[in-house]
């Protein structure tokens, strides 16, 4: 379990464009984007035999801000993985991993072009499509490792 609160210090800037328009940003004391305040990680594993291991991984990421102004954010989410690893012999390992076995859906990271959106402006983006990163979908992955 981790609780953290990283904030920006001395993070402000302004610019005047050729047409005289001015724009500025002040992120002082705002929580760093993409860094959740709460992290929980649970990683149980069980050796069924000395050559066969079953494992799970549950990772919780709390509310995460998507831009500098703390105007856009992602709700907390779980990321889940699980798998089986089998050491067939001293030269061959086989594995299967299931990614996102709870089939969680949602976005993470940042939203492109949103850096300067303020809390007052955020409501105008409700219901709009925006580009960003998304949670990995439910997948099953197979692996083999051969040692000489």
Language-model features: locations:
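Active-site lining segments that contact anionic ligands and/or coordinate catalytic metals
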Residues: 51-53, 77-81, 91-93, 139
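Residues on the lipid-exposed face of transmembrane beta-strands in outer-membrane beta-barrel proteins
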Residues: 1, 42-46, 56, 82-86, ...
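Gram-negative outer-membrane beta-barrel transporters
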Residues: 1-64
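Residues that define the transmembrane beta-barrel architecture of outer-membrane proteins
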Residues: 34-40, 76-80, 136-140
């Amino acid at each position: 379990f981790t609780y953290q609160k990283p904030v920006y210090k001395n993070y402000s800037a302004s610019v005047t464009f050729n047409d005289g328009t001015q724009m500025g940003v002040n992120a002082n004391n705002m929580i760093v984007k993409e860094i959740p305040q709460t992290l929980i990680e649970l990683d149980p594993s069980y050796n069924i035999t000395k050559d066969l291991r079953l494992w799970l991984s549950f990772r919780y990421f709390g509310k995460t801000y998507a831009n500098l102004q703390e105007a856009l954010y992602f709700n907390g989410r779980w990321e889940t993985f699980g798998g089986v690893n089998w050491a067939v012999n001293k030269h061959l390992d086989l594995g299967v991993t299931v990614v996102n076995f709870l089939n969680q859906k949602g976005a993470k990271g940042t939203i492109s072009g949103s850096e300067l959106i303020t809390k007052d402006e955020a409501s105008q983006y409700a219901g709009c499509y925006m580009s960003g990163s998304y949670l990995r979908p439910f997948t099953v992955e197979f692996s083999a490792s051969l040692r000489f």
